[in-house]
Amino acid sequence: MYGSLIRIKEIINDLNPSERKIAEYILNNSKAISDLSIKELAGKSGSSKSAVVRLCKILNYKGYKEFRIAIAKDTVNVDKEENRYTDINPKDDLHTIIKNISYNNKKSIDNTMEVLSEELVEKASEAISKAYRVDFYGIGASYIVAMDAFQKFMRINKNVRATPDTHLQVEFASNLKKGDVAVAISYTGETKDTFESIKAAKEAGATTISVTKFGSNSISDLCDINLFVLSPEITFRSGAMSSRIAQLNVIDILFTSVAGRMFEEVKEFLENTRKSTRVKRIK
C-alpha cells in the first residue's frame, strides 16, 4: 500500500458521509481512478464534484489532477505482496521477518516524506531555535521518541525536558511561557495524558508542535504546528514499530534543521559532548 491510499485509510473515519463515499469507492476501485474524470468519480461514488475537491484538499493534494496521478503511481504494483505492510505471522521464517519488518520501516519513512510539510518543518525549527525552553511529551513508545529528542537537543545545549511521569509533564507544561515550545508525540493523536500536557502548554502561551498520524485528531487540532507521519496501524499493533521509526525520523529532521540554523553557536557544544563520551568507549 502506497502513500495516497494510506492517507485515505488513515482519515476515512473522520470524513463526512459524502466524502466517505468517495474514499470507499477509491479504495475498492483504485486501479480505475486514473481513467475517471472528477465528474465520473463523483457520479460512480454517489457523491458530488465539490466533495471530490474537498477530499483532495483534506489529503493535501493541490487538486484532482495531482491526486489522480498519485493514485495511478500507487496502484502500479498494488497487488504485489511485497508492497503491503505486514504484521506478526507465526508462519513466517526468519528471512521473511527480516524482509517484512525492514520493508515496513523503510516504507513508513518514504510515506512520511510525502505528507511532511517543508514549510511547517521550517516553522517548527525556527520556533525551537529561538525558544528558551523546549518540552517533549510522549507516553509508551512515543516516550522513547521524546527521550531521543531530549538526548539530541541536549547535545547542542538547548534547555530541553522529557519525563515519563505524566504529572510532571503537565506541571512542566503549565509553567511554560510565551516563546517556549512544547512538542507532543503521539501516533494516534488521542493519548489522554499527552493531550492534557500539550493543552496546558498552549494555555500557558507556549508554541505547540505535534508529531502525530496524518489527518485530524485531538492533538493535531489543538497544536500550532503539525508534523504528520504516515505509517498505517497493523491489526496486532506489534509494538508501534514502523510508526515509531517514522516519528524518530521526524525528530532527526527537526534536530538537523535546528543544529544547522544554529551551527556557529552550537558546534562547540557538539564537539564537547563528543569528547566527553569518548572515554566511555572500550576502543
Swiss-Prot record:
Domain SIS: start-end pairs: 124-264
GO-annotated molecular function: carbohydrate derivative binding; DNA binding; DNA-binding transcription factor activity
One Pfam family in the UniProt entry: SIS
Keyword Membrane: no
Stored PROSITE patterns: HTH_RPIR, SIS
A biological process term (GO) from this entry: carbohydrate derivative metabolic process
Keyword line: DNA-binding, Transcription, Transcription regulation
Location of the DNA-binding region in this protein: 38-57
Residue ranges constituting the HTH rpiR-type domain according to the UniProt record: 2-78
PANTHER family documented for this protein: GLUCOKINASE, HTH-TYPE TRANSCRIPTIONAL REGULATOR HEXR-RELATED
Name of the molecule in the record: Uncharacterized HTH-type transcriptional regulator CA_C0191
Organism annotation: Clostridium acetobutylicum (strain ATCC 824 / DSM 792 / JCM 1419 / IAM 19013 / LMG 5710 / NBRC 13948 / NRRL B-527 / VKM B-1787 / 2291 / W)
